[in-house]
From Swiss-Prot:
It is found in: Virion membrane; Host cell membrane. Palmitoylated. It comes from Choristoneura fumiferana nuclear polyhedrosis virus. One of its GO terms (cellular component) is viral envelope. Belongs to the baculoviridae gp64 family. Disulfide bonds: none annotated. This is Major envelope glycoprotein. GO terms for biological process: fusion of virus membrane with host endosome membrane; symbiont entry into host cell; symbiont-mediated perturbation of host process.
Length: 509
């Protein structure tokens, strides 16, 4: 009896499976904890309607200048208190009609040069001060001063002029209330100046007028905008709204005109824009001074920000790579688990017709299998595809033709907005405009010529070289010649007298 009981126990023991699960020691119930998925702060909106107003980056400006230097002198001798030289340096305003004519002829009009006009001719210093009658391609004055006519007045006058059609940068400005826009011209410091096609502006020693009226164009356009929300609790709160316009990035968060140089952009924002948080980096509006030159420190700061962004991106990529690998390992475990039920799963994933047979928990064999050619029915020869397997079939009424199948979408494809660096439009410094270079050059020419004074009148190159007035030079030359002539005559007379004395004495003996 005892032997029988032991035999039964042994049979039960060896008939049990290799793995045993005890149902009486269960725990739970359990539920798999899903990770929370936070919605992104960024939202991409397509077909956002905006209005773009645009004008030319620069405009043609006619720049002209005209002026004269005059020296009116009187020579009454060193004892006369009226002996003096009255200098006048005058810059004349050029009228619009003159500027237009100068631009057409590519010449400027001045008055006649007055050189060493003395006596009654010196009255010319009081005539034709408006500079008419002489056309030149450009002229710089000569500073002449001479006062060598005793008891006479002397007049010297020299003219200067120039004309150029040059470029000056523009700025487009639009009013937020009535949406009216205007184009202004910028000076060397980037400030607006009042120069139009109808009004001549006189400044910095020149006169300037627009060659033609500035125009601008309006056009609607649909663009893509990226909305960034820093406040997750308020879905309609938008901190920034970056829109891609002509391959350039603009922040159109506010319902106002955003003007950059020669372009203004505006859209009607449907969201409520909150005050930006007072933190550094992209959450703070950029501080910039248009037209100001960047320093080496500014560029190094930008480089530092780029390095930070690059390191941050690298860290996020490494974290994402590790997480993807973790998901892949979890997927491998899931495939192994399901493949123990579906022996064709591994082969289907490899796109190969094989069947798997597991030897242990993670070790298996692969066996080749036959696979029917492509078909449009669930029947093939004497087989039917049923519940994931090809089985024998004798009932042809179960065959279905699925050549005209329909696709059923169970999820939506995610469309990514690929990051790109904006094609930023860079602007040259305001003072680099050719118009201001022309003005600076004419000022430099005037300074150079005023440092060189001509003291003579007509044909007085020697007086210019010796830096003497014509009268002084003549006096010195005459005194030099007369003195040497007197010495020569005196010497010759003495020699003749001595010769005669010697000759008379020889006759007496």
């Amino acid at each position: 009896m005892v032997r029988t009981a032991v035999l039964i126990l042994l049979l039960v023991r060896f008939s049990e499976p290799a793995e045993h699960c005890n149902a009486q020691m269960n725990s739970g119930p359990w539920r798999i904890k899903n990770l929370s998925i936070a919605p992104p702060k960024e939202t991409l909106q397509k077909d956002v309607e905006i209005e773009i107003v645009e004008t030319n980056m620069d405009e043609n400006v006619i720049i002209g200048y005209k002026g004269y230097y005059q020296a009116y002198a009187y020579n009454g001798g060193s004892l006369d208190p009226n002996t003096r030289i009255e200098e006048t340096m005058e810059t004349l305003n050029v009228a619009k009609e003159d500027l237009l004519m100068w631009s057409i002829r590519r010449q400027c009009e001045v008055g006649e040069e007055l050189i060493d006009q003395w006596g009654s001719d010196s009255d010319n210093c009081f005539r034709n001060k408006d500079g008419r009658g002489v056309w030149v391609f450009g002229k710089e004055l000569v500073k002449r001063q001479n006062n060598n006519h005793f008891a006479r007045h002397t007049c010297n006058r020299s003219w200067r002029c120039g004309v150029s059609t040059a470029k000056m940068y523009t700025r487009l400005e639009c009013d937020n209330d009535n949406d009216e826009c205007k184009v202004t011209i910028l000076d060397i410091n980037g400030a607006s100046i009042n120069v139009t096609e109808n009004t001549v502006l006189h400044r910095d020693g020149v006169s300037m007028v627009l060659k033609q009226k500035s125009t601008f164009s309006r056009r609607p356009e649909k663009v893509a905008c990226l909305l960034i929300k820093d406040d997750k609790s308020d879905p309609r709160s938008v901190t920034r709204e970056h829109c891609l316009v002509d391959n350039d990035i603009f922040d159109l968060s506010k319902n106002t005109w955003l003007c950059k140089f020669n372009r203004c952009i505006k859209r009607k924002s449907e969201n409520v824009v909150k005050q930006r948080p007072p933190t550094w980096r992209h959450d703070v509006s950029a501080k910039h001074d248009e037209g100001a030159s960047a320093t080496k420190g500014d560029l190094m700061h930008i480089q530092e920000e780029l390095m930070y962004e690059n390191d941050l991106l690298r860290m996020n990529l490494e974290l994402m790579h590790a997480h993807i690998n973790k998901l892949n390992n979890m997927l491998h475990n899931l495939i192994v688990s399901v493949a123990k039920v579906d022996e064709r799963l591994i082969g289907n994933l490899m796109n190969n017709s094989v069947s798997s047979t597991f030897l242990s928990d993670d070790t298996f064999l692969l066996m080749p299998c036959t696979h029917p050619p492509p078909h449009t029915s669930n029947c093939y020869n004497n087989s039917i595809y049923k519940e994931g397997r090809w089985v024998a079939n004798t009932d042809s009424s179960q065959c279905i033709d699925f050549n005209n199948y329909k696709e059923l979408a169970i999820d939506d494809d995610i469309e990514f907005w690929i990051p790109t660096i904006g094609n930023t439009t860079y602007h040259e410094n305001w003072k680099d405009a050719s118009g201001w270079s022309f003005i600076a050059q004419q000022k430099s020419n005037l300074i150079s010529t005023m440092e060189n004074t001509k003291f003579g009148g007509h044909t007085t190159s020697l007086s210019d070289i010796t830096d003497m007035a014509k009268g002084e030079l003549n006096a010195k030359l005459w005194s030099f010649m007369l003195g040497h002539a007197f010495s020569f005559m005196l010497t010759v007379g003495v020699i003749i007298f001595l010769f005669c004395m010697v000759r008379n004495r020889s006759r007496a003996y």
